[in-house]
Amino acid sequence: MSSITTQKPNITVCGSGSGGLAVAADLAMAGCRVNLYEIPAFSSNLEPIREAGGITLSGLPYYGKTGMARLNLVTADPAAALAGSELVFVNVPAMAVGPFLTEMAAHFEPDQVIVVTTGYWAAFRFRELLTETGAFDRYIFTEMALMPYLSGKAGPAAVEIGNWKRALYLSAWPATGNQKALAAVQKVYPQTRLCRNVLELNFRPGNPGVHVQIALPKAEFFFERARQFRFYGEVSRCASKLTDAHDVERMAVAAAFACETDTWPDDCRTIYELEGSNLYEQHGGPADRHAQKWNHIEEIERLLVEDICYSFIPMEQLASVAGHSTPVTTAMTDLSAVLSGYDYRSEGLTLAQMGLDGLTVNEIIDYADTGRYR
């Protein structure tokens, strides 16, 4: 439980899924003026919130208050949603970030700090739109490694927070905006820490997650029989071994790009205060809130697409630039495609799509730092 110690900033929260409702409700209960925005295609999701007069918040929010969270504005109008806000949190899956930025970018206001809480190389993927609309001189664009909460919808206008992150990691693109971004976000989440650049941020554990590593050892269950289940309650010792092996590859590629990062177990000790030396020991017990959360197969299928298409595949390609190989990551990608029937590689994020094709390691680092090609 915490409190805002500086002047309460005005907030815009984007996305009406569980992540967006969790951020909107908790910060509104903390005293922020909160606008909730949804793109027009999904504006019907806002009607229950308007009818209820806000969002019912339960569980374990960061600011410790539960009940009815009253919002300043609930809208599908991007200009109205963004007006007067210091911070803009975009809380949607990787594949949904594009539609939100396309609707909003022209309406970003001077000095606003835009935070995509799911990372997944958002800055590089949308670099042209960001450059055209003022990411270098008008507003600050940032990525986080993870959403601030473990949450789930408890109804069309209700959200339950199962846990909150004791550490959040952030970087701006270009990295010259890091200090201003950090100062703004720490007004509401003082546990936020800075990564050197968006390269370092995207090499952190979290996003990528461990959904592939958990699913593969129990492939028959997840790909043939599972419909509703406690996903983290299915963590096996084999999943731990895959996680450790992936960590070795991920951390080696990160080091080649002058980035520091943690293992998954070390990160879980930091952000969730979980004890244990590996994935199984941390998530395999009844005390773990992740293991208590119910999931649907459709949610896990989406998470596999995110982790593989937006993390595993670009990491393979960055490894190649640095002269490294990623045999475990490659094997998990290809085996997941065979067992799920989903062609991840046809949708995987490429260096060309990220604007990094043909660049050297040092040129990629420089691009992350400055936003400029040499």
Please annotate each region the language model reported.
Residues 166-267:
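Active-site-lining helix/loop region of Rossmann-like oxidoreductase modules
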Residues 2-61:
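NAD(P)+-binding Rossmann beta1-loop-alpha1 motif at the extreme N-terminus of oxidoreductases
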Residues 33, 72-73, 140, 193, ...:
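Conserved beta-strand segments of alpha/beta enzyme cores
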Residues 240-374:
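NAD(P)-dependent Rossmann-like dehydrogenase/reductase catalytic/cofactor-binding core
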Residues 64-108, 112:
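Rossmann-like NAD(P)-binding element
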Residues 94-157:
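Rossmann-like NAD(P)(H) cofactor-binding subdomain of soluble oxidoreductases
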Residues 129-194:
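Predominantly flavin-linked oxidoreductase catalytic cores and closely associated redox partners
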